[in-house]
Amino acid sequence: MSKTHLTEQKFSDFALHPKVVEALEKKGFHNCTPIQALALPLTLAGRDVAGQAQTGTGKTMAFLTSTFHCLLSHPAIADRKVNQPRALIMAPTRELAVQIHADAEPLAEATGLKLGLAYGGDGYDKQLKVLESGVDILIGTTGRLIDYAKQNHINLGAIQVVVLDEADRMYDLGFIKDIRWLFRRMPPANQRLNMLFSATLSYRVRELAFEQMNNAEYIEVEPEQKTGHRIKEELFYPSNEEKMRLLQTLIEEEWPDRAIIFANTKHRCEEIWGHLAADGHRVGLLTGDVAQKKRLRILDEFTRGDLDILVATDVAARGLHIPAVTHVFNYDLPDDCEDYVHRIGRTGRAGANGHSISLACEEYALNLPAIETYIGHSIPVSKYNPDALMTDLPKPLRLTRPRTGNGPRRTGAPRNRRRSG
């Protein structure tokens, strides 16, 4: 993290449990980010919190620190059973649940608290085996949590801490009934610590969320600016026929170290992947129907640097901690204004600079006015020379080939720059 991303407030300044402070410092966390500095005084005093901050500002560590401190500082309820977790952290996607679990592991190792993970798609028996041995903190998606609860594999009657991460997406995806079902099986709101964190939190969502909280305190960081000030935003207006060639030309120009390309449909993502893989790029594909194990492998390869480009639907836009993403390309402008914020928030994280490039084609240009109204500013427009777009492009690959494009990255200098002056 850069110094500009941190505050003067140190974790050791708070009355945190010593084991929590030790674990944080061992991982190199000394100074708080703004959202952590705002949230911790409240949660340590037992106050419920609804926190809004840009992605990459430390929301996950804010609620994990609060959760571990609370459980270490307060005894479990009397007669707690082995199938009763003490804390429940709910996430909208499998990938985010896995990421939270990974972030929590160093704290669990240092404190002795046991973690459990519950998400759909695969691993049912493996996850259940961990739960049957007893866990203190259960992290998961609502569908699998309800499945385990209905079969009495877990009982929520001993919950002391509840977290909703990416709360707006939880509601947007229609999980409101699931969330309420789970809350009804917990102790009353005033008998537990409740936390909500998200990059965007509408008044509608805030009102719904507060039904399940105890006079929560609303905190936010940089509320006047929905897109990070370290992200350079840029917009092009290509025709549908020139759109793919423009994308490939921009990639040649920018030569990004690590880029995510977002499109609105699975079919479009597969099309983009095919063109880039054929052109020799180390590119991965992440859509909703990719098997869970393969999705996690692709994310790991992208994070390690084995892949340079990730083509994705919005499944990858929320909550994932992928470091050092230098560029985000919106091949399609999203239909949901909030998705624009979450997409470009993959870059410019943790105090770094980032670059977002959006293509307003004939099909999705009508989404632009609502996006610009939502973010509160116009996206700067750049022009290009149609005659200078790349033409020497190979035939795109089909998905009968490996999705992750494991061939070597093309070497040599980028082709000549093709933007008009």
Swiss-Prot record:
Residue intervals of the Helicase ATP-binding domain: 40-219
Compositional bias segments (type: Low complexity): 402-414
EC number(s) from the headed UniProt entry: 3.6.4.13
Gene Ontology biological-process entries: RNA catabolic process
Chain intervals for the UniProt region annotation (Disordered): 392-421
Superkingdom of the organism of origin: Bacteria
Predominant cellular place of this UniProt entry's protein: cytoplasm
Annotated localization: Cytoplasm
Keyword Transcription regulation: no
A Pfam family of this chain: DEAD
SUPFAM superfamilies cross-referenced by the UniProt entry: P-loop containing nucleoside triphosphate hydrolases
Catalytic reaction(s) noted: ATP + H2O = ADP + phosphate + H(+)
GO annotations of cellular component type: cytosol
Motif position, Q motif: 9-37
GO molecular function: ATP binding; ATP hydrolysis activity; RNA binding; RNA helicase activity
Keyword Glycoprotein: no
Enzyme class at the top of the EC tree: hydrolase
InterPro entries per UniProt: DEAD/DEAH_box_helicase_dom (IPR011545), DEAD_box_RNA_helicase (IPR050079), Helicase_ATP-bd (IPR014001), Helicase_C-like (IPR001650), P-loop_NTPase (IPR027417), RNA-helicase_DEAD-box_CS (IPR000629), RNA_helicase_ATP-dep_RhlB (IPR023554), RNA_helicase_DEAD_Q_motif (IPR014014)
Residues reported to bind ATP: A53, Q54, T55, G56, T57, G58, K59, T60
Record's function text: DEAD-box RNA helicase involved in RNA degradation. Has RNA-dependent ATPase activity and unwinds double-stranded RNA.
HAMAP family according to UniProt: DEAD_helicase_RhlB
Family note: Belongs to the DEAD box helicase family. RhlB subfamily.
Subunit structure: Component of the RNA degradosome, which is a multiprotein complex involved in RNA processing and mRNA degradation.
NCBIfam families: PRK04837.1
Protein name, per record: ATP-dependent RNA helicase RhlB
Species whose genome carries this gene: Escherichia coli O157:H7
